[in-house]
């Protein structure tokens, strides 16, 4: 009989052993190799004693998968999923099961990273290009982004673009029509305050009466559901050099005249209605489309068409010089993570339904709205909007209607002025319309849906006037007209997936990105209707499950970070930075020190840091780093003293972007506090802190947390993300507020930074499950194992490559930087060559040239096994041997496996390959482990310069893919 106790047999910590890659024996072997007796001994060697936490976390014990699912099922069951006709940018939708199963629930799609390595990302790049084509066609404009975070932040980006490109250079006022969504106005006002813009609101028709405008914003259709032909108004505004921006409903554009045809300069909106659940506010992809002449001022990523070295059509991210990782504080936006997974879902939705299928859906929604309007009119209810697509507004006995609606499990929109609104959706049926008659009119109304429908068919409908009926063709590309059976759709999705390298194939060692396991059990609740189908503006009593989940997750994050409160609203790390800096700004203003506007940022900082500081209305002053990569204290003291009167804050990353624990971090905090500033600690590297130290304990005042890094939300190929901020008590009143829903800790006058009060709440169950399953012990052990993996890999690679920057006891924290510059000087081989050659070995490249040009930054997470680490090491050692052959002159600098990487099937089938000085086998099967699990790049190295000089960002002819 076994000697194990019942507690041991119950395996409460089984998930912990599944999440962590190396088993106990492998961990000990690795510890022996790096010269440590245990994980605790290694921790003591790495983490400065002055900042060690000195306590265990208090987030509970570890749990098994079944127990974790049972706990979260209890929370889900506390949510009441009513039929929500609230609208306001959030609508019911049917997620095609072929997309649900093969994209949303498929690690081949949700575990990939942003396509910085396009040769191994052609599948999702094509899906994103489809999203851009969809956006271009429906809006009637020229150039679309790869997605933004949500509709409201897209509106703020539209305002910023308008200011950049407007010829009315002296104008400082932005007009917002008073019938836009309230959350949109809220986010726009927040951004405008930072930029010093004046916001004026009023009826849309009065926009042209203002003379000092650089831009204007309109909603199409508006909050009440009214349709307006803006063609004449837009012409008047353009004559005054006003940039016209429009928030549009994507489903309505299937039937309506496009804003581009009316003369809009920029059109944005949410793609949520195209097969993405409401998720209590997100995540959803926003579309953003502009005229071609504004392309250099566009925010966010843009996918463009280029050529590879064989002349084959290939896709890649275009015009990256606009972005934060290059332009820093001069960037158009701080957008980094966006919503690629959700953009892909929306694009696949359009591909699956095609233009004809979309017309059927849109016409059904519109017909049901016509039926509802006709029935109400027949019973004496006056519909306030005279034209509509899917939304009606009317005045009735609000109390009686609300009571009947709640009794029926239905949510309507109740405006402050006694107006009731109803927005219909793809999920609405004729039975639902009959139920709405009962709710609005009471029993005994005698209306029959079929009879009203027959009458409308006979007499026609004028709710969409002829001038607003769409005449432009859309989605004519073959991609949107070829995959309408589930078999063909499934195979199309699979063909694209096969072109991409994700975590389900191999380790992704991107430094500062924390590409850890996104466990299946953590992902499961995301698809549950109790989480997926909740409207963010539903009555709070219906969302008790979400309320408890968000509360518990916030409490855990408070314990982990050492802060006093958490704000869940920011829906990306960059938005978290922005929100944290706004809290600092408002704190200073509350003390009569609004002049404090200088943000100190070390030269090694993430590009989002200076970009976010600029968005928050701050001036960036860069501080130096010493030769070891640490913040130069002498320079910091001098800069802090120099700007003391105006010092707002410092933004630091810990461990540093150089991958070490700086011994002087508390001194850094003290210097800033002594001069009246606040400390913003970037949470990008939190995976090396959890359970060992904490930003609040160190001395920081505010941090954002990348839940899509440290807390297991997947990267989705470029989003979604979540960037909640933790704050000390004195900053808590200054976190983001919301015009529609209060969160509980913010002051009333705080503006919003995201469209939804709790950001992308639909993915918070992932992080909740991650913490619930690992518990206090597992979280700490995960951090320690991540550091063990990093130090093991570093010591192995240091025998072949120079390693920059080490901390105490010659250790690194959780990532290392390999210096390729000496090898480049000796051989001509670049860090780019090594990155592309790793593709041939089946690996995604590490982070290139950040934070130091000419380097590779490698971060192996705790989820990677010793076997996978050894396979990566084997690849890097083999590549070093290849570099040596170039160095010795055996291979020419311009014709070797590195210079020609990555290699494709086309290469090895080409008879001309025989002229190369290396074999086909070495090109594509450089090691036996590669032969056993080969990943084939589908294009050769892509010409970025060609792509930007010949910018094309829409779908190409099908023949180009052949």
From Swiss-Prot:
Biological process (GO), any one: glycine decarboxylation via glycine cleavage system
Record-level GO cellular component terms: cytosol; glycine cleavage complex
EC number: 1.4.4.2
InterPro entries on file: GcvP (IPR003437), GDC-P_C (IPR049316), GDC-P_N (IPR049315), GDC_P (IPR020581), PyrdxlP-dep_Trfase (IPR015424), PyrdxlP-dep_Trfase_major (IPR015421), PyrdxlP-dep_Trfase_small (IPR015422)
Family that this chain belongs to: Belongs to the GcvP family.
Assembly and binders: The glycine cleavage system is composed of four proteins: P, T, L and H.
Protein name as catalogued: Glycine dehydrogenase (decarboxylating)
Organism, scientific name: Shewanella amazonensis (strain ATCC BAA-1098 / SB2B)
Lineage of origin: Bacteria, Pseudomonadati, Pseudomonadota, Gammaproteobacteria, Alteromonadales
Gene coding for it: gcvP
